A protein has these predicted regions:
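Short runs within selected transmembrane alpha-helices of multi-pass transporters and secretion channels
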Residues: 69, 138-156, 167-175, 193-206, ...
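Residue-level hotspots within pore-lining transmembrane alpha-helices
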Residues: 23, 27, 31, 61-65, ...
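Helix-terminus/linker motif at the lipid-water interface of multi-pass membrane proteins
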Residues: 30-48, 118-125, 181-188, 250-277, ...
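N-terminal transmembrane alpha-helices
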Residues: 6-43, 56-71, 75, 100-107, ...
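Small-residue-rich hydrophobic transmembrane alpha-helices
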Residues: 48-108, 145-163, 271-335, 367-389
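Transmembrane helical elements of multi-pass membrane transporters/channels
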Residues: 16-35, 137, 171, 200-204, ...
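Short alpha-helical transmembrane segments in multi-pass integral membrane proteins
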Residues: 1-18, 76-141, 185-240, 297-363, ...
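Membrane-helix interface/capping residues of multi-pass secondary transporters
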Residues: 36, 45-48, 85, 114, ...
Length: 442
């Protein structure tokens, strides 16, 4: 049975509606993880470090799609809640068009930024050259990567989360098969890994574009539109928190890599890469749930259904709490097997990775609440509050921690800084939720 945004959502229905978005985010994370697995095990730790070194810049450029998807999705859902279907389709078409054009411009810009950014982070020799090779191939598919991120959010708004899941699974499976072929069978190293990812991103961006360009049974389709500056600015404002979050995380990742090069060398960067890969899967569950439930929040906000808003918030926080405990336990129990999956060929690097993960796992107890809190305010069209939560969580607290903690605990301080930043961010999120309660009636 197809679930409508106007339905009443109990725990079962809420999870059913959000599940496709959760799986979508997991499969999106698999792109990077599969690359990392094959590159590390078949091309060696220098190639693995090269991918990890340049990845933050690529994520900064790609997260424009997440900004348009979450920000536009919130505005579209609110517009549908106000019973303005034609206007919703015009906004939908506007943001798809603008984001695709942004992708082309950013791809050209990124092409020239790759080398100076890699050199700034301390890369040289083979590490530098492999970073640039990987980055330039990925940039060819950047417009499709942006569209893929965007459609992952908008499929839920169109009340077609399962269709979004099928597209993401198809592109994810394509990535895995191509990685096995181009890195495992044909030893093309970072070139093969980048080509596999670029092709899968093309699939993930083009298939939804074709679907929405034709007549379909969803609530959204591409139509003729007038350039609406106000709607575009509102979209960017709503999605600024998600954009800022991804940009900040990428900037912080660069700083982590610089600190790790200082305290542990290339092995430290490789260990951090393993943490980030595993974290992508765990965080994808929180992000997927937040993205999947955001259209429901936005619709009920537009319909002024405060009773449903209260129920959605309380149920969501309970679900996140249960997931957080399970993720922490899984992180502690499977630190060693997960480490062996990526760096089992190097005992010293494996030992460092397992130790780091046993500390890092504590962050899972707190991160989901801040991720959901930011998304919740985006869905309420309160982009400023959402951006503040993201800015504090992903930039201010992380920067402060990663600069100060190593002065006290050296290498362990770098791993502890992630946990410390999440504790500070959940405190800020709770304060914002309490402070805005009367204004939004939740």
């Amino acid at each position: 049975m197809n679930i409508k945004l106007s339905d009443y959502f109990d725990y079962k229905r809420l999870l059913r509606f959000a599940l496709p978005s959760i799986i979508m985010m997991i499969f999106t994370s698999i792109y990077c993880i599969v690359d990392g697995f094959f590159v590390s095990n078949y091309a060696g730790k220098t190639a693995f470090a090269a991918v990890n070194l340049i990845m933050p810049l690529l994520l900064v450029l790609g997260c424009v799609g997440f900004m348009f998807g979450t920000g536009g999705g919130a505005l579209i859902a609110k517009t549908m809640g106000e019973r303005k279907a034609d206007k919703a389709n015009e906004i939908f078409t506007l943001i798809i068009t603008v984001s695709a054009l942004c992708g082309v411009v950013l791809a050209v810009l990124g092409f020239f930024l790759l080398r100076p950014v890699a050199e700034f982070m301390g890369a040289d020799g083979e590490l530098l050259e492999q970073s640039i090779i990987y980055g330039r191939i990925i940039l060819i598919a950047l417009p499709f990567y942006i569209l893929q991120f965007e459609f992952q959010c908008l499929f839920a708004t169109a009340e077609k989360p399962k269709l979004g899941l099928y597209v993401t699974v198809a592109s994810g499976v394509a990535n895995m098969i191509l990685d096995a072929l181009l890195v495992g069978v044909i030893p093309l190293g970072v070139t093969g890994a980048a080509a596999a990812t670029a092709i899968s991103e093309f699939i993930g961006g083009v298939v939804p574009l074709v679907y929405f360009a034709r007549k379909n049974d969803s609530r959204l389709r591409l139509v003729k539109f007038k350039f609406d500056v106000k709607a575009l600015l509102k979209t960017c404002t709503n999605g600024s928190s998600e954009f800022m979050s991804n940009v900040s995380m990428s900037i912080v990742s660069m700083l982590y890599n610089m600190q790790l090069m200082k305290y542990a060398g290339a092995d430290g960067v490789a260990a951090y890469g393993v943490l980030m890969y595993v974290s992508m899967i765990f965080q994808a569950i929180f992000i997927g749930f937040a993205v999947g439930t955001a259209p429901i929040v936005g619709f009920n906000f537009g319909a002024q259904n405060t009773a449903e808003l209260k129920g959605l918030l309380s149920k969501s926080l309970r679900i996140i709490g249960v997931c957080a405990v399970f993720m922490f336990a899984a992180g502690e129990l499977f630190a060693s097997p997960l480490g062996k999956l990526f760096v089992g060929y190097d005992d010293e690097l494996l030992e460092m990775t397992v130790h780091a993960f046993s500390i890092f796992s504590f962050s899972f107890l707190f991160s989901g609440f801040s991720i959901y809190g930011s998304s919740f305010f985006t869905a309420l069209n309160d982009g400023l509050t959402s951006a503040m939560i993201s800015f504090l969580r992903t930039l201010v607290f992380q920067l402060a921690a990663v600069l100060l903690f190593p002065l006290i605990w050296e290498l362990d301080g770098i791993w502890l800084s992630i946990v410390g930043a999440e504790v500070m961010s959940i405190t800020a999120t709770v304060l914002f939720l309490i402070g805005k309660r009367k204004r939004y009636g939740y």
